[in-house]
Every structure is written in C-alpha cells, then in structure tokens.
Amino acid sequence: MWVTKLLPVLLLQHVLLHLLLLPIPYAEGQKKRRNTLHEFKKSAKTTLIKEDPLLKIKTKKMNTADQCANRCIRNKGLPFTCKAFVFDKARKRCLWFPFNSMTSGVKKEFGHEFDLYENKDYIRNCIIGKGGSYKGTVSITKSGIKCQPWNSMIPHEHSFLPSSYRGKDLQENYCRNPRGEEGGPWCFTSNPEVRYEVCDIPQCSEVECMTCNGESYRGPMDHTESGKICQRWDRQTPHRHKFLPERYPDKGFDDNYCRNPDGKPRPWCYTLDPDTPWEYCAIKMCAHSTMNDTDVPMETTECIQGQGEGYRGTINSIWNGVPCQRWDSQYPHQHDITPENFKCKDLRENFCRNPDGAESPWCFTTDPNIRVGYCSQIPKCDVSSGQDCYRGNGKNYMGNLSKTRSGLTCSMWEKNMEDLHRHIFWEPDASKLNKNYCRNPDDDAHGPWCYTGNPLIPWDYCPISRCEGDTTPTIVNLDHPVISCAKTKQLRVVNGIPTRTNVGWMVSLKYRNKHICGGSLIKESWILTARQCFPSRNKDLKDYEAWLGIHDVHGRGDEKRKQVLNVSQLVYGPEGSDLVLLKLARPAVLDDFVSTIDLPNYGCTIPEKTTCSVYGWGYTGSINSDGLLRVAHLYIMGNEKCSQYHQGKVTLNESEICAGAENIVSGPCEGDYGGPLVCEQHKMRMVLGVIVPGRGCAIPNRPGIFVRVAYYAKWIHKIILTYKIPQS
C-alpha cells in the first residue's frame, strides 16, 4: 500500500399462428427469435403480496428473468394461467402468479432483491391492430351496455365458449376478439335487444398523444409503424446500443416503449428484427400541441441560453461566415430535418437553430464541401450570478435550475416536505422552496440540491458552481495554491507489517474476481471508498464484489469467515470529493470477523502528531506479494509542515488531511485506493481519511494527502438516512 401505466401486447398474436407456413414470413422469424421478456412490464425492486390465501403461487430456482418469462408465457408446468412473475435476484428464484397487481386482494410491496414482471396483455387498456391478444378487464360496450359472461347463454345463445377457444382468455364478461375480426374486441351484451357490440378500447398509439417531436412522449406504444416489436431498452440483443436506462434516467426508457431520446423527427425504437435496427413508431399528434413548462426551452433572439434549443434569432451563417442552407431545401445537402418533420422547432428560412439537442445552434451550409456547421458566434446570454452560481454553501441560492448533476428533473418541494422534515430539526423557509428549483434548505455544506422522482436516487446535488472569487475555504495558515496530483497507478502499503488485529471493517473490492481497491464498512449496507475505483458511472455492477472478513486478499484460510456481497448502487460524493458510497445488495452480517468502523463528527480536527494507520492489500515493495493485509503507521501533519515536505507546492483545504511516516518509508501504494486512514481518539477508532491517488508509492519525506472524511460526514449521514436500505 503506499498503500494504496398500461401496456400493449404483441401484434396480432393470433394471426401469427396462421403464418407459419409462409415461405419467409417476418413474423415467424421474429417469433422464433423473440425474447418473451418484451411481453412484460417491469417494476424494479417490487414484489406482490397476496392477501387472499386461495390465490396460488408456483416457485422454482432459475438463473435469469428471461427463463422465468419463457415459462410464464408458455405456462409450462404451471397449474394456472400465468399473468405475472417475480424474479428473486439474490436467490435466483422465480415466483409465478395467476394474478397481477390489478387483482383484488393483491398489493405491491418494495423488495430490494425482487423485480416484478407483469404480462402486458392482462394490464393494458389499449389494443394493437385488431386487438386479438387483448386480455384486459373492460366489460362495457361502446354504447355503455354491460357485457354478457362468455360461459352464459342468457340472454344470448352462442358458440363462443371458453372451452372452445382455449388460449383466447374468454373469462368473466371481458371484451375479447377471439377470431381477430375487424372492429376490435367485442362481447355479447346483457341487453336482450342487442346481441353483440364492439367495446370502446383505444389503440395503443392513441392512448397518449405526442407534442412537437415526441421528446416528452411517455406512452405505452411498443410496436413500430410496420408492426415490428420493439426491443427492450435494457437489453443489447439483437441490437447493441448506448441508450441504457441507468445512463439516461430522464429519458423514460421503460421496458420496450417507443421514445425519442436523440432528437429524431418522432419517437422510435430498436426492433427485434435482426435485419432492422430501428424504425419509427406511429403515434398521433395531440390536437392542441401544449407542452409542460419544464419541456419548453427559454426562447431568445439575441443570445443563446443553455444549448440554444430556444434560440429564435436571425443569424444565418456559421462561425466562419459560410451562409446557411434553407431548412426547406435539399440542395446542396439532402436531409430530413425539415419544417414538416420538426414543426415546433421554428425552422424558418436559413436561420441557425438547434432542433435535435446538439451542443449549440447549427445549420446545413451552402458549401457542398461543408455539410453542417455550428453558429458559435452567437453570444451566450448573460445570466445573473444568483442563477448560475452560488456563494457560501448556497443556502441563499434563488436561481431557477431544476435538474441534478446526473440529468434528473427535480421533484416539487411541496411533495417532499415529509422527507425533508425527517433529516432536519428546524422548520425550513417554505418561501424559498419554489416549485422544483434547486435549493439548500438543510444547510448542506456542499451546495444546492433537490429531490428527484427516481426511487433509486431520492436526491442529488445540482450542477451549480461557486461564484467566481468565492472558493472553498482553506485551513488556517494555509495560503499556498493547490497543485493537482500527478497521475499514478493504483496504490499499495509499502513496507507495512502484516496485521491480524480487529479490522473487520476492512473491505477488498473485486472486479471480476481481481482486487482493485480497499474500502471501509461504515454501516451494514454501506461501504466508503474512493471515486477513482469507479471511474465510469456506467460500469456494470454485476462484475463487482465486496469481500469482508478476510486477511488474505485471495481468501486463503478465510473461507469460514469470509462474506462476499454484491454491489447494488454507486452514490458519488459531492463534486471534487473523490469519494463514493457503495450500497450493498444485502446487508453484511456483523460477527467476530466483520464489523463497522465509526465516522468522525462533522468538521472535527485531529491533533498534529497523532499516530494513525493505513491498511491495504496493495503493492508492498516486493515483486512477490504475499497477499496479506498490511498496516502502516503514519502521524498527522499540519498544513505548514506538510507544505514544507512538498516543497511548498501543496496547500491543504478543509476537505484534505495530511499524514506521513516519521522514519520508515511506508504508506499507501497501488491497490490501496479507497482504503482508510484510521485514527483513535478517546479509545474510539474512526476513519479519518480515505486513500486516493498520490504522488508515488511511499516516497521518502513525502507525506500523503487523504480525503478528510470529517468534512463529508454530513453528506454520508444524509445518504444513509435518505437512501432505502435493502431488506435482509
């Protein structure tokens, strides 16, 4: 260590059966290749609880949700018609149900290890095509007459018995279209004078209309305009893509519904046809194209606000003076960004515009050799400092930003007052909590924030910087400029001695079974480590594990006490903190070998020359590392002395702490990142610092600079208090 809402179904499913003999039918190929998971609506971290003891459940161990879906669709080995299932991710087990969340006597319940999948056929309120696969619960005809039960001959005799049309779900008196006839689902009526009548069930393309180009469309359409089934956004087959739900949480990437995340003329989706990567979806325009206030960009004519999507000025040349091509012209460049396709983007004449969410206004040019160019000569709008920056900790910030740093739209404060009261001990100033604007009602040291509508990220900081000249305070007598650390490889504790003391809070973070970083167990479900261990927000967490209760990094001899836990979520620290909190998929079990370590009080300081320790499995100065956990003893240095050792090139601010070895060359190195600097005060051991990349491995007379945990203690407590903990 230096150390170191309602959903559609498959198109004309009943017709597909009659197409099997056609020579090269698309539907046949699609059905063979189709992943049945596309037929289900997913509710993450949710399970169903039945209050009626007569309702049956079937369960069996299976490896994937896809396998559960296949058995549910085929009803293979099930004594009932499967309408939904839950996949237990931790135990790799399926639970199949003959009911769903709309069934009387059934309720949804949060469960961290569960994902609920409901067959869209049974919960949607719309139809695709003729509605042959509709299995919803509408039981009233278009004129308002109650339907006659299918197994009844009163008042009308008929041959449409459930036993004669197996698979058509002729249950109760629900509207159905068992023969796939024109007109859609129908039923025999309870009126002796009216034998049968169609039911008023809308097409899924009409359940929710779209405005403008459908960027805000969140409806249930899951087929393309040619009838192809959409690929799930959370799947990479048959087409690999970048639009992952976790990467774009505000784009509405639910299941396999049509969306428009990239500024195309209208909503689209990837398809299940390997030969057709994507197609547009047929969704009707709203009669009155009104948009929510949060969807409308600020219109400007003399300057650009944000990315300039609301620019409506008359600049008509790119940055180097080349004139723009008219938007309604196809010469010299052909394109589909026309006034007809983008009716609400004001594509008049040849004015610079940003219809597709690019980084700034642009246009096609009249030069055949220059297809497009940015109009970067348009100035940025002047924004008052109260809107685009904050002073102090931002408690008086009154700007109108309403998005988090991860791109999530803020939730209205009035909807979150109960949650806010849970972690503050005073009555917040409601007059400041306007709409869903970023604010700092709890005096957070790290700036304005807001609640979100995402249950996985209850709240987050907003991308607002401190105003110019209002910098982070430095520690007393520290007045030298901060120099960025040179890039180094992962750190390890060099010349540390093996330790077998009680360090049950020490964590080895593994990526594909290889140790990459250390960490500290601060709560049963939470690990504190360094951001450098997770450089990308979009890495697949299934490849990561947390090993606890071990002394040997390979687990040799530690099998009986070792706990291996999956990581379910990353929570990045405040901007510039170099910290990340890991939420475990299930809580660690505290015993003689696994324990938690205390956090310091917010803002506390530790006296100079206090002896502390760093722990890690990193590089030890030897080619043949034994893989044992090592400890190196360091002492706390003040700013002045630390700066001297760094030739005056380093100044500590309030988020940093300095510690070094007195004589022996020891300290963190490769593999120790994320590990703790542990100090003892009043017989209590605490994690005072976190190891982050330094300036080399245990360089003589070069003390290490750690992230000062005390400065971020309130943030850590706030995360633990507000983020839901997985159930054991």
UniProtKB/Swiss-Prot annotation:
GO biological process assignments: hepatocyte growth factor receptor signaling pathway; negative regulation of apoptotic process; proteolysis
Keywords from the UniProt entry: Disulfide bond, Glycoprotein, Growth factor, Kringle, Pyrrolidone carboxylic acid, Repeat, Serine protease homolog, Signal
PANTHER family attached to this UniProt entry: HEPATOCYTE GROWTH FACTOR, PLASMINOGEN-RELATED
Post-translational modification: The single-chain precursor undergoes proteolytic processing by TMPRSS13 resulting in an active two-chain form. The single-chain precursor undergoes proteolytic processing by HGFAC resulting in an active two-chain form.
Protein name: Hepatocyte growth factor
Protein family per UniProt: Belongs to the peptidase S1 family. Plasminogen subfamily.
Source species of the chain: Felis catus (Cat)
Complex and partners: Dimer of an alpha chain and a beta chain linked by a disulfide bond. Interacts with SRPX2; the interaction increases HGF mitogenic activity.
Disulfide-linked positions: C68-C94, C72-C82, C126-C204, C147-C187, C175-C199, C209-C286, C230-C269, C258-C281, C303-C381, C324-C363, C352-C375, C389-C467, C410-C450, C438-C462, C485-C604, C517-C533, C612-C679, C642-C658, C669-C697
